[in-house]
C-alpha cells in the first residue's frame, strides 16, 4: 500500500478492484483546509479517463508492472499490434487503452510494453520522437519578431505548436511528455 502523495505520472495502482494509471497529477492547496490531489486517471482495461480528487493520506495498492522492449508494428481495426523484441511474439492492445500514446506512434518505433501479471496494460514511449510535418501555414516574413509559433499537424495526427520557420515535409523532434516542439530532426 502506498499513499496517494507518492503517486507519479505513469504509475499503475489498484483501487476498488480496478487497475488505474495516473495520466496527470496536481497538488492543490485550497485557501483553508488540507492539500488535495487532483488526478486524471485511466482505467487500463476499459481505457476510460476520469478526473478525480483524493486526499494525500489515502492509501492505494501499488501494482507491480513488468516492462518488455517492443516494436510498434501496425493498426488493425481498433487495435494496435506490438512485437516483443526478445521472443518476437505479437501482442494486441485496444487503442482506447493507449489513446494518449497513439498520437506519437510511428511504424517500427521502439517502445516498452507494460504488463500486469501476463496482461498487456499499456505502452511507454521514448522521451522524444521524430515526426513529420504534413500540414502547416507557410512562413510569414517578420513573424519571428513576436516568436509565437504556429500550429502544425504531424503524420500521426498530433497538432504541435512550432516556430514560424518550420514548413511542410520537415521532420521535427517532439517531447512525448507534453507534446511540445523540441527541435528540428
From Swiss-Prot:
Family statement: Belongs to the elongation factor P family.
SMART domains: EFP, Elong-fact-P_C
The protein, known as: Elongation factor P
Species of provenance: Limosilactobacillus fermentum (strain NBRC 3956 / LMG 18251)
Function: Involved in peptide bond synthesis. Stimulates efficient translation and peptide-bond synthesis on native or reconstituted 70S ribosomes in vitro. Probably functions indirectly by altering the affinity of the ribosome for aminoacyl-tRNA, thus increasing their reactivity as acceptors for peptidyl transferase.
Keyword Ribonucleoprotein: no
Gene Ontology biological-process entries: peptide biosynthetic process
Pfam families referenced in this protein's UniProt entry, alphabetically: EFP, EFP_N, Elong-fact-P_C
Location of this chain's protein in the cell: Cytoplasm
InterPro entries (alphabetical): Elong-fact-P_C (IPR015365), NA-bd_OB-fold (IPR012340), Rib_uL2_dom2 (IPR014722), Transl_elong_fac_P/YeiP (IPR020599), Transl_elong_KOW-like (IPR013185), Transl_elong_P/YeiP_cen (IPR001059), Transl_elong_P/YeiP_CS (IPR013852), Transl_elongation_fac_P (IPR011768)
